[in-house]
Amino acid sequence: MSNGGNAGKKSSSYFHFTAGLGSGILSAVLLQPADLLKTRLQQSNHASLLTTIRELSQSPNTIRSFWRGTVPSALRTGFGSAIYFTSLNALRQNVARSNLLRTIGVVDAKNGPVHSSSLPKLSNLANLTTGAVARAGAGFVLMPMTIIKVRYESNLYAYKSIMGAGRDIFLTEGFRGFFSGFGATAIRDAPYAGLYVLFYEQLKKRLSHIVHSVPQAEELVENLGVRKNMKGSTSASINFGSGVLAAGLATAITNPFDAIKTRIQLQPKKYTNLVMAGRKMVGEEGVKSLFDGLGLRMGRKAVSSALAWTIYEELIRRAELAWKGEEVIV
């Protein structure tokens, strides 16, 4: 999976699916409280974060209240990440192998600078496009689980179980109810994923260059025993830092679509489509309503995306080294 056409021979889609599944589930479980708080904030008219936390803390089972909806969230994020990373890798491999989008320059990593990643190196437009397409496809497949997750986390519905939530949605809204807000979700997720991959790859390249251009950093790398491929903790640190910054930027740009999407999924009868929902929210609550939950979403996305991508890249790196029979340097 390192650069270009031989990448697909070095690791199968199985590795990408498994790595994506594991990283997605782990990040979802750890960050479920932040996701639940974001949903509660976006469903109401500017309820404060402290008030929401206080209400959850006063429930009979505090831990269970904060981790409500963990199962659908873990399933959605886990399998969503698995599908996303698998399809993203396939798209990136095909672009690199067949020289698609060559007019805007597929990067030749063999002659390029040292990089913290073993994944294909593509141009900015290729990174933006493949990230957006892969996320839109994964989002459509996982949309029913997303609807159940959001409804189950919300206090607008008194669902006792995940199965009960799914049954009620089907009986009251039909099969179409499982895809409420897909337009807003796709408009949010596709640009977010595309921007994230674009920012992430650029930041990794720049941070890798800094590490090997600054004498002190170069000395530190040598002391760690890290060679040209930047294996081990240095690579993981660069990937994580790049992920945090990339997620923060992409989240801030796409948050209005996330706020609109949540309203459509929670109250589909009141907010029937993307345009109407946006106008209604701004008209009744002001522009600020489009940025409800931004702080929580930015914090959660920064950590979850960075964590998922760092774990994913590390698992793939180790799988490739094991595949080639090389020693794994941590």
UniProtKB/Swiss-Prot annotation:
<feature type="transmembrane region" description="Helical; Name=2">
    <location>
        <begin position="69"/>
        <end position="95"/>
    </location>
</feature>
<feature type="repeat" description="Solcar 3">
    <location>
        <begin position="234"/>
        <end position="318"/>
    </location>
</feature>
<comment type="function">
    <text>Mitochondrial glycine transporter that imports glycine into the mitochondrial matrix. Plays an important role in providing glycine for the first enzymatic step in heme biosynthesis, the condensation of glycine with succinyl-CoA to produce 5-aminolevulinate (ALA) in the mitochondrial matrix.</text>
</comment>
<protein>
    <recommendedName>
        <fullName>Mitochondrial glycine transporter</fullName>
    </recommendedName>
</protein>
<keyword id="KW-0999">Mitochondrion inner membrane</keyword>
<keyword id="KW-0472">Membrane</keyword>
<feature type="transmembrane region" description="Helical; Name=6">
    <location>
        <begin position="293"/>
        <end position="311"/>
    </location>
</feature>
<dbReference type="GO" id="GO:0005743">
    <property type="term" value="C:mitochondrial inner membrane"/>
</dbReference>
<feature type="transmembrane region" description="Helical; Name=5">
    <location>
        <begin position="238"/>
        <end position="264"/>
    </location>
</feature>
<dbReference type="InterPro" id="IPR023395">
    <property type="entry name" value="Mt_carrier_dom_sf"/>
</dbReference>
<feature type="repeat" description="Solcar 2">
    <location>
        <begin position="122"/>
        <end position="206"/>
    </location>
</feature>
<dbReference type="GO" id="GO:0015187">
    <property type="term" value="F:glycine transmembrane transporter activity"/>
</dbReference>
<keyword id="KW-0812">Transmembrane</keyword>
<comment type="similarity">
    <text>Belongs to the mitochondrial carrier (TC 2.A.29) family. SLC25A38 subfamily.</text>
</comment>
<keyword id="KW-0496">Mitochondrion</keyword>
<dbReference type="GO" id="GO:1904983">
    <property type="term" value="P:glycine import into mitochondrion"/>
</dbReference>
<dbReference type="Pfam" id="PF00153">
    <property type="entry name" value="Mito_carr"/>
</dbReference>
<dbReference type="InterPro" id="IPR030847">
    <property type="entry name" value="Hem25/SLC25A38"/>
</dbReference>
<feature type="transmembrane region" description="Helical; Name=1">
    <location>
        <begin position="17"/>
        <end position="42"/>
    </location>
</feature>
<dbReference type="InterPro" id="IPR018108">
    <property type="entry name" value="Mitochondrial_sb/sol_carrier"/>
</dbReference>
<keyword id="KW-0677">Repeat</keyword>
<dbReference type="GO" id="GO:0005739">
    <property type="term" value="C:mitochondrion"/>
</dbReference>
<dbReference type="GO" id="GO:0006783">
    <property type="term" value="P:heme biosynthetic process"/>
</dbReference>
<keyword id="KW-0813">Transport</keyword>
<keyword id="KW-1133">Transmembrane helix</keyword>
<feature type="transmembrane region" description="Helical; Name=3">
    <location>
        <begin position="128"/>
        <end position="153"/>
    </location>
</feature>
<feature type="repeat" description="Solcar 1">
    <location>
        <begin position="11"/>
        <end position="94"/>
    </location>
</feature>
<feature type="transmembrane region" description="Helical; Name=4">
    <location>
        <begin position="181"/>
        <end position="204"/>
    </location>
</feature>
